[in-house]
């Protein structure tokens, strides 16, 4: 049986949407394939982009809560009440979008007075 491509294309052009849908389903079943568009897989980059902005998060105040509140006030510029609320409601973000060096300095200051700090 010789295939005439032009006749097949002409038949497809004349078919209704329902007939074409049935044709696709029949082809999928007959050949075990799917008509779904392939999903593009993101190419893995050589190295992950280096993070440039960090968030300093107070995990807990530790044993010396008053000292931690003082350092939080110094770092954030918050008033006493706001700094106390922040420390009481830990874990909370202290500073967001800071450079790595500044984040490490803040972490060191807080850990020096007994706080548990995470840099994300």
Curated annotation (Swiss-Prot):
Transmembrane segments: none annotated. Gene3D superfamilies: 3.30.1390.10, Single helix bin (1.20.5.710). It comes from the Bacteria. One of its GO terms (molecular function) is structural constituent of ribosome. InterPro entries: Ribosomal_bL12, Ribosomal_bL12_C, Ribosomal_bL12_C/ClpS-like, Ribosomal_bL12_oligo, Ribosomal_bL12_oligo_N_sf. GO terms for biological process: translation. Keywords: Ribonucleoprotein, Ribosomal protein. GO terms for cellular component: cytosolic large ribosomal subunit. NCBIfam families: L12 (TIGR00855). Forms part of the ribosomal stalk which helps the ribosome interact with GTP-bound translation factors. Is thus essential for accurate translation. HAMAP family: Ribosomal_bL12. Homodimer. Part of the ribosomal stalk of the 50S ribosomal subunit. Forms a multimeric L10(L12)X complex, where L10 forms an elongated spine to which 2 to 4 L12 dimers bind in a sequential fashion. Binds GTP-bound translation factors. Belongs to the bacterial ribosomal protein bL12 family. This is Large ribosomal subunit protein bL12. It comes from Listeria monocytogenes serotype 4b (strain CLIP80459).
């Amino acid at each position: 049986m010789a295939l005439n491509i032009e006749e097949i294309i002409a038949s497809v052009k004349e078919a209704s949407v329902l007939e074409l849908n049935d044709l696709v389903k029949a082809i999928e079943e007959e050949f075990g394939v799917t008509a779904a568009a392939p999903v593009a897989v993101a190419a893995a980059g050589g190295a992950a982009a280096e993070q440039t902005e960090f968030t300093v998060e107070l995990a807990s105040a530790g044993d010396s809560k008053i000292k931690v509140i003082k350092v939080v006030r110094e770092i954030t510029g918050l008033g006493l009440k706001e700094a106390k609320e922040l420390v009481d409601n830990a874990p909370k973000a202290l500073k967001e979008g800071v450079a790595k060096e500044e984040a490490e300095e803040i972490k060191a200051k807080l850990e020096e007075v007994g706080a548990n700090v995470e840099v994300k």
